[in-house]
Design a protein with these regions (language model features):
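Short coil/linker segments at helix-helix boundaries
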Residues: 93-99, 144-172, 203-207
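Conserved, well-structured interaction surfaces
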Residues: 44-48, 81-151, 174-182, 272, ...
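Inward-facing hydrophobic residues that define packing positions of alpha-helical scaffold repeats
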Residues: 108-111, 166, 173, 209-210, ...
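Hydrophobic-face positions in mid-chain alpha helices that act as interaction patches
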Residues: 200, 204-280, 290-293, 298-378, ...
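Sec-dependent bacterial lipoprotein signal peptides
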Residues: 1-20
Length: 480
């Protein structure tokens, strides 16, 4: 009924406008830009792959910023970005959710079109180009399975359950592993590990993680942006380029990691890592903890600390960032501040930067507050697991990854189910998934108490500890 009514409304609008002296854009054609003309150009696969790679950047832009807002990583203190996710108000009408779903579908369909239509039209298509397109297609499946409980994987198709979608990601990443490009092959192996990790397939995840490490022990695979020609990095805009609007304020215990992205020049935007080898080691460490092998886990965690310590750090001016602009004295803004991860927890120094006293130095690939000494001191499996999830949070900050670790899944967009005859408002996937132990504190995910005079900041909820306390839930910590 809803679709019929919508159709009549659209038809009515078309009929009403048909009497006006307007140019119908659908009647304007360029004979040089038809599908046939483009496919008949020399080697059309090369520009097509470049276009799909650009779509990868658009897909990253479509999810990283608003998913970071939804997590405990950042609080949105302005109105420019998503106003719902900060308190986990997840609705089918959300424009960002619709945009994310649209860009996922576009990435998948563009890759698929290249693998079928463009490939058949271009005899010069290489095996590496096919592998790269399969990599992008698999990444679309991976994000779909990580962030939606159900989602269509074909245009107008039925909604598919997330486990099945992640299975599709695994199979498609396998097709990309054959690439002679080590970065793509290793990233595909890591994609297989990541999908199997989320599925709880420990043996398969460990095997793929080890494969990725052996191929590229320092792997970082980026989505690239272009500051001059676009697309620009939306998260860079939110964290840095909008200057003293200060839209996204980081949780104080991760102040030293912010901003991961900054202005690098008129033609150079900060890239976003979508795969990096740290994740393979994190998977191996969590597998060891789930096997009750604390010593093995500590060994891997030490490797992670050392790897992170070797990663690039950038020094730049960030004095336009004002932690207390809207409410003076409300947020830590100098390096003398000590931070507790929860009420009663030990005070920790060195987590907050001075931004008004000169340049700051920030990790731009991975960073962590965990030291080798911290790892050496671990003598309890749950404490090790909490530390590992702290490392995951810190390493993946500003990459749109945290919400999946919190067990949260988005909803099918209203735009999708109004247009798709296979999905209705009450279909599976049209309600969000939020673990009850997160839902009960969703209004305080970013909350902290700050005594500016004493220089002490106390985070109200240690989400990593809460995740560990609920490790047997099927919604979080997949190996437990």
């Amino acid at each position: 009924m809803k679709k019929t009514a919508l159709t009549y409304l659209l038809l009515g609008g078309i009929l009403m406008s048909s009497g006006c002296d307007l140019v119908d854009p659908t009647e304007v054609t360029n004979p040089n830009l038809t599908e046939e003309a483009i496919l008949n150009t020399n080697n059309p696969m090369t520009p097509w792959v470049a276009g799909v790679k650009r779509q990868l950047a658009l897909t990253v832009n479509a999810h990283v910023t608003f998913l970071e807002i939804g997590s405990d990583n950042y609080e949105n203190v302005q109105t420019f970005y998503n106003q719902n996710l900060d308190n986990l108000t997840i609705r089918p009408q959300d424009a960002d959710i619709n945009g994310f779903q649209f860009q996922l579908g576009r990435l998948r369909e563009m890759a698929d079109y290249g693998l079928t239509v463009v490939k058949n039209a271009d005899p010069l298509t290489t095996a590496d180009q096919e592998a790269e397109l399969n990599f992008y297609k698999a990444y679309s499946y991976l994000l779909s399975g990580e962030y939606f409980s159900f989602l269509p994987v074909t245009a107008g198709g039925e909604a598919v359950e997330w486990r099945s979608i992640l299975g599709m990601a695994v199979e498609t990443f396998r097709l990309a592993e054959s690439s002679s490009n080590t970065q793509i092959s290793a990233a595909a192996s890591l994609g297989i590990a990541r999908a199997n990790y989320r599925l709880g397939n420990k043996a398969e995840a460990v095997q793929a993680a080890n494969s990725a490490i052996s191929k590229a022990p320092n792997l970082v695979y980026y989505a690239q942006f272009d500051q001059a020609q676009g697309p620009v990095n939306t998260m860079q805009t939110a964290l840095y380029d909008r200057g003293n609007f200060d839209d996204l304020q980081v949780l104080p215990r991760m102040d030293f990691l912010d901003p991961k992205y900054y202005f690098r020049g008129a033609s150079q935007a900060s890239p976003v890592a979508i795969f990096k080898i740290e994740e393979a080691h994190l998977i191996l460490a969590e597998a060891a903890i789930s096997d009750n092998n604390l010593n093995s886990a500590k060994s891997v965690m030490t490797d992670i600390v050392n790897l992170v310590g070797s990663r690039e750090r950038s020094t730049f001016n960030n004095n336009q960032q004002d932690r207390t602009q809207l409410n003076p004295g409300s947020r830590p803004n100098n390096s003398d501040v000590q931070v507790r991860f929860s009420p009663g927890a030990p005070l920790i120094e060195g987590l907050v930067l001075d931004r008004k006293s000169g340049n700051v130095t920030v990790p731009t690939i991975s960073g962590t507050s965990v030291s080798v000494a911290d790892v050496d001191a671990l003598n309890d499996l749950d404490d090790a697991l909490e530390t590992l999830y702290l490392m995951r949070q810190e390493i993946f900050i500003a990459e749109g990854r945290r919400l999946a670790d919190m067990g949260i899944k988005l909803v099918i967009s209203e735009v999708e189910y109004l247009a798709n005859p296979n999905i209705d408002a009450g279909s599976p996937g049209t309600s969000p998934v939020i673990p009850p132990f997160i839902d009960s504190i969703k209004d305080e995910l970013d909350a902290f108490d700050y005594d500016a005079a004493a220089g002490i900041c106390t985070i109200r909820h240690n989400i990593n500890r809460i995740l560990v306390e609920n490790k047997t839930s099927e919604l979080v910590l997949p190996f437990h």
